[in-house]
Amino acid sequence: MSILETFDPAVANAIRLETERQEYNLELIASENFVSEAVMEAQGSVLTNKYAEGYPGKRYYGGCHNVDIVENLAIERAKELFGAEHANVQPHSGSQANMAVYFTVLKPGDTVLGMNLAHGGHLTHGSPVNFSGKFFNIVPYGVTRENQTIDYDEVERLTLEHKPKMIVVGASAYPRIIDFAAFRKVADKVGAVVMVDMAHIAGLVAAGLHPSPVPHAEFVTTTTHKTLRGPRGGMILCREEFAKALNSNIFPGIQGGPLMHAIAAKAVAFKEALAPEFKTYQEQIVKNAKALAAGLVKQGFKLTSGGTDNHLMLVDLSETQLTGKVAEEALDKAGITVNKNGIPFDTRSPFITSGIRIGTPAATTHGLKEANMEEVAVLIADALANVENETKLAEVKGRVNAMMKRFPLYAHRLA
């Protein structure tokens, strides 16, 4: 037995059950992924014990020479990975990364243009329940009704009308390529700063499979998990002219001591992302997404914007008898994990929704390929055709478990 199993069997058992879920269920939540053993080892290291307020070479605590090495490695690797002038790897999350940029550029009450959460944006892009919507004057932009892609004409019209101090670009449920150059061109007409939140697509950007926002934005924020496949956390890239102000808005602005064990794990993940095989892996994520999208369409499902260019897709259930909530719960019983998600112009509440969001990063990490995605589409269809049939859902779960056992990832942790 492990030390944890001996001392706290309740926590140890919950961890084991979650390991089994990640190993044998099909994880299709677009924002989730599975880290490598190297990342996990760094995350669970003795660096968790070290306070290191400040930055490398300028700490408020002694004994930081070793963690300075780690943070400098993370910074330099991040800059190399994305071609950025400056990187701050201390944000605990993507939301805190975004908050730091807001506070670097804006004063309370300033006007910000951000993507409507209901159209695929993020809470931190101006939702009224979030700090961004409470502290700043938010003007939302969205997608067109015709093809559910970003309405760049609306972006320009709203920008010229409201003259925002900052334009926030990026999304949490948008399946198409984003034209960062178009946002830059519009922003320059009113002297606005551009912040791109590339949390969902950072891995694709690193691999050259999605245009990079770095040349077009003063600030680029991201999480370090999702497609990037690192530990849970955040990061900010910016132009050198903003480095000092940005750093001070992270510490002491909104955070105290950085999580050095998480920063070590980020450094490891960035090294993994710099390796040639990472591009192959990201290519497979996109191939799998396109194959799954095609498979779902073949099964009769409707996708917003008609498909996907990246790692995710949004299934539109508005013309069926299902809600996103019912679909999520049924799929969970079938061993398939997705999340209910609003679709553009949704008439249902965010707690019910008319869609589900599906992504391929975690399944790709397990080793699934395009042919498996066709099988996944059939499994999803079978489950959603039998949402009230517990026997059928259990049968689908058996098929899911059998498939996933062919693609072990953490099986050694269950031995």
From Swiss-Prot:
It comes from the Bacteria. GO terms for molecular function: glycine hydroxymethyltransferase activity; pyridoxal phosphate binding. Pfam families: SHMT. The record marks H225 as: Plays an important role in substrate specificity. Its cofactor is pyridoxal 5'-phosphate. It is an enzyme of class 2 (transferase). Pathway: One-carbon metabolism; tetrahydrofolate interconversion; Amino-acid biosynthesis; glycine biosynthesis; glycine from L-serine: step 1/1. It catalyses: (6R)-5,10-methylene-5,6,7,8-tetrahydrofolate + glycine + H2O = (6S)-5,6,7,8-tetrahydrofolate + L-serine. InterPro entries: PyrdxlP-dep_Trfase, PyrdxlP-dep_Trfase_major, PyrdxlP-dep_Trfase_small, Ser_HO-MeTrfase, Ser_HO-MeTrfase-like, Ser_HO-MeTrfase_PLP_BS, SHMT-like_dom. The keyword Magnesium does not apply. (6S)-5,6,7,8-tetrahydrofolate binds at L117, G121, H122, L123, E241, S349, P350, F351. It is found in: Cytoplasm. The modification N6-(pyridoxal phosphate)lysine is found at K226. Its EC number is 2.1.2.1. One of its GO terms (biological process) is glycine biosynthetic process from serine. Belongs to the SHMT family. Homodimer. This is Serine hydroxymethyltransferase. It comes from Geotalea uraniireducens (strain Rf4) (Geobacter uraniireducens).
